[in-house]
Amino acid sequence: MRKTLLPLLAVFALPLAHAASDGQKQADDFTKLYSSTCFAYLPELGKLTEKLADFPPVPEEDAQNFLRGYNGKAWIVPHEPENYIIAVMPEHEHCALYAYHADAARVEKQYLDFVKKPPEGFTAEPYEDTHDTTDGIKTHTITYQWKASDSEDKPTFMLTTSTDPQSKIQAMISVAILAKD
């Protein structure tokens, strides 16, 4: 399944059109980076780890905030006006990208445009759509799964956004391959 998924994933990792405003560009850059890293390398996260080796690592004590208790590594991806953080957890086939600030509405639109159009042979199914408040910070999480009748693997995509200026992370997008229930 992973060998057939790789070429399909590459098709979806194409660059996005140039945006008109800074907010749009910021969201587009976030989505483009996700597409060319976590998504494009999902079946082979070890190769992504090799490509990220030249980027500055997040210090180990801080990396745990991005790894969510899993084994893996996190890197700082230089970007103007702010850097991104990418966390790769190969043992769990899980990759996540974090933005300190993002245009939540545009990131959500791009995410939904993407996950609702799976490659041929897959269906897209909404899994979760929740609004939460933690420590006074409001977040919105949207999760989709792609399913194929001939595979036990389910690429699962999750986006969490916040429009709260006090939020330390305003966008987090991740992908993991989960086994069927």
Put a short name on every predicted segment.
Residues M1-T4:
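Positively charged n-region of N-terminal signal peptides that target proteins for export
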Residues P7-P15:
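Bacterial N-terminal signal peptides
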Residues H79-T141:
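Long, charged/polar, surface-exposed segments that mediate recognition or autoinhibition
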